[in-house]
Every structure is written in C-alpha cells, then in structure tokens.
C-alpha cells in the first residue's frame, strides 16, 4: 500500500469567503424596505451572498425582475465606494462608501 501526501495548499489560491451584509447594514436596508412596503411600493425582497458581491433585491411583485438592487462590493471600497443602488435597467443610480447616503436615491 502506498500513501500519497496531498500537495501543499497555497492560501492565495483559496476561494475568498462570501460577501454578506452585516447587521447594521441590514438594519438600514430593512428600515427603508419597511417604509416602502407600508407605502405600497415594494412587496418582496431577496438576498444573495456571493464571493464578490452581496445583493439585496427589491421586487414590486414576487415573480418579476427586481426594481432595485442594493449591492455591496468590498473590492471597490477604495475606488468608487463599495455600496451601489442599481435600477431595473442596470443603470447605477448611486454609488458610495456610506450606505446611509447611498440609500437616499
């Protein structure tokens, strides 16, 4: 019987952990969501946590494309800001480093 040792693991090649919204960020987003639901504008939401981006999608109805997407991309922290609000057509409505100001679209 022969034993094979696994090749060394290069930490730089390890997949990065997924990006997620932190509790204070979700509190801001859900506060806005609650106000818009009460106004009858929004009805549903979805959250996606991927490797490079976390997305909070807002829907008018469950079975349609999102009206808005609130994205968090930490790699853009030093450049354009890691938060962005994107419209239904894919246009970036607002981008910045502070989520509270970005949500004032």
Question: Language-model segments: which ranges?
Answer:
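Short, charged/polar surface micro-motifs in flexible loops or helix N-caps
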Residues: 51-54, 61-66
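Residue-level detector of beta-strand face positions
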Residues: 57-59, 84
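Short aromatic-glycine-(Arg/Gly/Cys) micro-motifs in beta-strand/loop hairpins
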Residues: 2-4, 14, 68-90
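Short, surface-exposed beta-strand/loop "edge" segments at domain boundaries and coil↔beta transitions
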Residues: 63-68, 91-95
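Negatively charged, low-complexity tracts enriched in Asp/Glu with abundant Ser/Thr
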Residues: 4-54
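Mixed-charge, glycine-accented linear interaction segment located at domain edges/termini
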Residues: 84-105
């Amino acid at each position: 019987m022969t034993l094979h040792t696994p090749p060394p693991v290069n930490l730089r090649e390890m997949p990065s952990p997924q990006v997620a919204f932190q509790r204070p960020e979700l509190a801001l987003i859900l506060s806005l969501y609650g106000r818009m639901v009460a106004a009858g504008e929004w009805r549903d939401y979805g959250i996606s946590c991927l490797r490079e981006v976390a997305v909070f999608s807002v829907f008018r109805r469950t079975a349609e494309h999102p009206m808005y997407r609130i994205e968090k991309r930490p790699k853009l922290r030093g450049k354009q800001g890691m938060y962005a609000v994107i419209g239904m057509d894919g246009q970036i409505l607002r981008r910045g480093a502070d989520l509270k100001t970005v949500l004032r679209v």
